[in-house]
Amino acid sequence: GAIYGNYNIGVIITEGKMTQQWHGEIEGCYWASDSQLYQLTRPVIGVDREGKAGAYWVGVPQQGTFYYYDRPQTNVVGQAKYPAVTATTPADAIDWNPYFAISCGPMVLYDGKAAADNSMVDDKHYYTNYECWDESGVYSAHPDRSAVGITEDGKIVLFICDGRIDESQGAYIKELGPIMKSIGCVHAMNLDGGGSTGM
């Protein structure tokens, strides 16, 4: 999924079993300038046992308990803290049983609409950074990008964008949603980019 320092901050589901899970709180800033803990939801994309694809946000109120939602917990770094995720917060939990799934983020396209942009709440925090990503590395940079998407007919699309050659200078997060939509996706999630894109 995704890492924060030396520990996992996402979920991975393999053959119906949660093989990686985190407790759903994280500090508001990777570099300790905001040590407040925020209850998070993370985007997750996967398929059920029949191969039907799904895209949701996953919340983990405590180890061993997790819920899927059709919207994120709308935290904004530096703003009011939202309550812990529950079976009804930030929305009623979705009954989804993925057979294979991975979380990363941010979600860049959901129901055909861009889910991340560069609008700011102040001079340093992005309004759509509900998942409290490192803003300097994820939002304001344009490195190599990797993404996974779902088309309207349920196909899974894997996408990479090189950012280290003259012909391609990577992509900003705000550009990734429209790119994924242009190749037929209705949902899309950013994966780890940079050097990971070369794998």
Regions picked out by a protein language model, each given a short descriptive name:
Residues 1-199:
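Gly/Ser/Thr/Pro-rich low-complexity, intrinsically disordered segments
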